[in-house]
Amino acid sequence: MQSFLQLVAHDLYAKIGNDLSRTVLVFPNKRANLFFNEHLAGESDQPIWSPAAMSISDLFRKLSVQKAGDPIRLVCELYKVFREETESQETLDDFYFWGELLISDFDDVDKNLVDADKLFSNLQDLKNLMDDYEFLDKEQEEAIQQFFQNFSIERRTVLKEKFISLWDKLGTIYHRYRENLAELGIAYEGMLYRNVIEQLDTTRLKYDKYIFVGFNVLNKVETKFFQLLQDADKAMFYWDYDLFYTKQIVKHEAGEFINRNLKLFPNELPESCFDTLRKPKNIRYISASTENAQARFLPEWVQSTLSTANEEKENAVVLCNCLLYTSPSPRDTR
């Protein structure tokens, strides 16, 4: 059975040919490209102009006029804005954890293309609702406190108190922080992604085709990015899934995401390539009473089962902690 990356290499070569110099492959991470190049090389006995390849995060960074900021510097810059807006005397040490949390929230806001003004306005309304129960009878108050139990007055920790007290400042902090970072030419990842989408000129892109391979759940900024390239006729999509999730099970969670992706961005590969789960499997169970027993069995299994380097590359071992120290050499280091 051909692997997903083999199918992609074969299909891409059939459609574009030997010269892939104006093509870039975009993967969720960097590892997949190592295997893809081997499969692509096997498609022809002639020299091939290999495509460029990068992760989605690398692609956004290349398209951005800003640089990804160092995590420590990002927190320090946020701390400056925080001090100015709140007049807080909190030290940087005390603020650091809270700063990382807030940057993570801002990152989610931008990656999901949320209207920040509306979001933080709604958060302030929620705070007011939770802080003032005078218009509710006792039963209604208890019901609301149960629903928002993580934020209820009785359960508030010091960290939550600090967070809630700043809700009315979050919108201002968010905008000022982004403005300051823009002046410095740096950004946190979500800000960088969002700026790319808002400023993207598809007529000035470096490559003729952007090949997106093996993605799954997309955030809104990725979806918008895919749509912009699709509209410019610069995108091709290869989705890895199985018909078991999209056809056999009604409303399976994984199937919902896959079907949405397939509807928005049709797959270059036919459905017939993705009907594997229903085929017979050869599954062997090994009884091991403890994790140490599993660890002792692994070297024996690797040496008796995987006889060639190619077999090693086509198999994976999911490691628990004790297994990390018992994998046989030299195969575990290649």
Residue ranges and their predicted role:
Residues 328-334:
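A short, hydrophobic C-terminal helix/tail in secreted or cell-surface proteins
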Residues 1-327:
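Nucleic acid-machinery interaction/catalytic patches
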